[in-house]
Amino acid sequence: MQVILLDKIGNLGGLGDQVNVKSGYARNFLIPQGKAVMATKDNVAMFETRRAELEAKVAEQLAASEARAESVNTLEGVTIASKAGDEGKLFGSIGTRDIADAITAAGVAVAKSEVRLPEGALRNIGEFEVSIQLHSEVFATAKIAIVAAE
């Protein structure tokens, strides 16, 4: 299925690219999320007239994401308290929701879908650097300290 991308999509293309994707991916994800439109003659003409507006919108989103990344990078002392055993192992784990809530409480709004934990949930006491993807091109790093709750 041919679609016109309205946003940069990883491993697919950038704004204005006409790409061929599976119909289920287009119908269930790209089109409902507003990231693509069907590549009909009318939509191609409509896109060409709105190209400058869409490029300005994408640039504005990128600038806002870079500003958020700067504020995440400057955060000091994001601490999460959790019950732990004597040897530093947590009872349970610290996941993306816990990290997003802690960073949001520290003053920068972060959604749990933006937190990246490639090794999975954190299960030990200590200091960790957590990657946060605020935009397809913008990454930030937050220092998280996990301490034992009293």
From Swiss-Prot:
The keyword Mitochondrion does not apply. It comes from the Bacteria. GO terms for biological process: translation. Binds to the 23S rRNA. Belongs to the bacterial ribosomal protein bL9 family. PANTHER family: 50S RIBOSOMAL PROTEIN L9. This is Large ribosomal subunit protein bL9. The gene is rplI.
